[in-house]
Amino acid sequence: MTNSPSSPVVLTNEEIMGLLPHRYPFALVDRVVEYEPGKSATGIKNVTINEPHFQGHFPGRPLMPGVLIVEAMAQVGGLIVKQIPDLPKGLFVFAGIDSVRFRRPVVPGDQLLINCELISIKRQRFGKVKGEAKVDGNLVCSGELMFSLVD
């Protein structure tokens, strides 16, 4: 983790890979620009035409699938849940979504700025995070994401 006394903690792609199990083509967070372990995180996803889903979604009018926007939000949220002190070590998996709304399309060339904040932890096994994804300051997706510890 890179930081100085006056700057927020940031994570490089390599550091993210040390915390999350996702790998290409499903690693959807390029870097983290703000990170308070166990509390909040802001990540960036650079959307490029080279991503495999754009071949069929949709030819001639490529749009990032909404489920992948939600997954990118979940990966940023996973960074928060993964670093909560005193939680058992193990694999936290995406377990559910509530109140997800899509506001505008995301296209190649966009940069998603994803902000997530911890809402709650229950029984040291279940986490809930509030997430928002924006492009150029405009909200494109928001919702609540749930995580569960897998034995």
From Swiss-Prot:
Keyword terms: Cytoplasm, Lipid A biosynthesis, Lipid biosynthesis, Lipid metabolism, Lyase
UniProt-recorded Gene Ontology molecular function terms: (3R)-hydroxyacyl-[acyl-carrier-protein] dehydratase activity
Subcellular location: Cytoplasm
Enzymatic class: lyase
Lineage top rank: taxon: Bacteria
Protein name, as recorded: 3-hydroxyacyl-[acyl-carrier-protein] dehydratase FabZ
Reaction(s) the record says it catalyses: a (3R)-hydroxyacyl-[ACP] = a (2E)-enoyl-[ACP] + H2O
Pfam families: FabA
UniProt-annotated catalytic positions: 57
EC code(s) of this entry: 4.2.1.59
Gene Ontology biological process terms, A to Z: fatty acid biosynthetic process; lipid A biosynthetic process
Similarity field: Belongs to the thioester dehydratase family. FabZ subfamily.
InterPro entries per the UniProt record, alphabetical: FabA_FabZ, FabZ, HotDog_dom_sf
Cellular component, GO, one term: cytoplasm
Gene3D superfamilies: Hotdog Thioesterase
Primary role: Involved in unsaturated fatty acids biosynthesis. Catalyzes the dehydration of short chain beta-hydroxyacyl-ACPs and long chain saturated and unsaturated beta-hydroxyacyl-ACPs.
